[in-house]
């Protein structure tokens, strides 16, 4: 399984190209890797781990779902590749500024929350790990934005109640601690 995850990591890194994390000089791929590592302590499901590595590819790169599927078919069976792509699609923001420029941030986030509440339990589980990793970085590097962001993600975790219970509780603890540390 580690060999497969290495190939998927390389694909994700290539897809993200020269993209860097917003608050550090790190290649973007460090974030999906950390998300995947968090999930590894809760599941060995290859589809969840692969989707974690690719969760921002559709949102942040020109790579398409079909290109991801074609790549995954080299390493996973068809059912696993399809499930992984479905998870990546679930985790891709729909109500973003690019697609909905007339909606303000609050409205976009509310619509996105309603959408996320309907995604699969596995998708919600990945979202918990994604939030945990982003909270660490944003809380430390952008305290002004963190005040808004932390309330948004707390609301997401409270609403997304179908994923891995232990990871959801851990994510809620991380967010609540970050909120407490803001004061």
List each language-model region with its residue ranges:
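Active-site helical microenvironments for divalent-metal-assisted chemistry
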Residues: 1-183
């Amino acid at each position: 399984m580690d060999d497969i995850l290495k190939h998927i990591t390389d694909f994700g890194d290539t897809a993200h190209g020269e993209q860097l994390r917003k608050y550090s000089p790190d290649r973007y791929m460090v974030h999906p890797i950390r998300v995947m590592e968090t999930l590894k302590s809760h599941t060995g499901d290859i589809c969840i781990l692969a989707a974690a590595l690719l969760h921002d590819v559709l949102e942040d790169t020109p790579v398409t779902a079909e290109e991801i599927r074609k790549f995954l078919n080299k390493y996973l069976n068809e059912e696993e590749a399809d499930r992984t792509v479905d998870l990546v699609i679930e985790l891709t923001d729909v109500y973003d500024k690019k697609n909905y420029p007339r909606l303000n941030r609050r409205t976009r986030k509310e619509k996105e929350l309603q959408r996320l509440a309907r995604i699969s339990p596995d998708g919600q589980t990945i979202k918990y790990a994604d939030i945990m990793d982003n909270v660490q970085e944003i809380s430390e590097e952008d305290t002004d934005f963190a005040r808004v962001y932390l309330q948004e993600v707390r609301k997401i975790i409270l609403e997304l109640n179908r994923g891995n219970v232990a990871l959801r509780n851990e994510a809620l603890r991380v967010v609540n601690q970050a909120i407490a540390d803001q004061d």
